[in-house]
Design a protein with these regions (language model features):
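Residues within the DNA-recognition helix of helix-turn-helix
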Residues: 33, 40-43
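Alpha-helical residues within the helix-turn-helix
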Residues: 28-29, 46, 67
C-alpha cells in the first residue's frame, strides 16, 4: 500500500471506527458500505502485518498495534 489519498481516507476511517467503537458506524459516517469499510481496514492490517482492531459482537476496540497507530 503506497501513501496516497486513498491511504489518508483509510486512516481517517480507522480513526473514526476507533472513536465510535463500531465498524458499522464508521462506514456510515463515511457514506460507504460495511463491506467497503472492512476491506479498507483489512488492507491496512495486511500492510502493517498485524491486526489493528479487535472485533467482537459488542463492537471494536484497537489492538495494541491499533493503539500505537491511533
Amino acid at each position: 500500500m503506497n501513501l496516497n489519498r486513498y491511504d489518508l481516507i483509510s486512516l481517517r476511517l480507522f480513526v473514526s471506527v476507533v472513536e465510535l467503537g463500531s465498524l458499522t458506524l464508521g462506514a456510515k459516517e463515511f457514506g460507504i458500505s460495511l463491506a467497503a469499510a472492512s476491506k479498507r481496514i483489512s488492507e491496512m492490517e495486511a500492510h502493517v502485518g498485524q491486526a489493528l482492531l479487535v472485533r467482537s459482537k459488542k463492537g471494536v476496540v484497537p489492538s495494541p498495534a491499533g493503539q500505537a497507530m491511533y
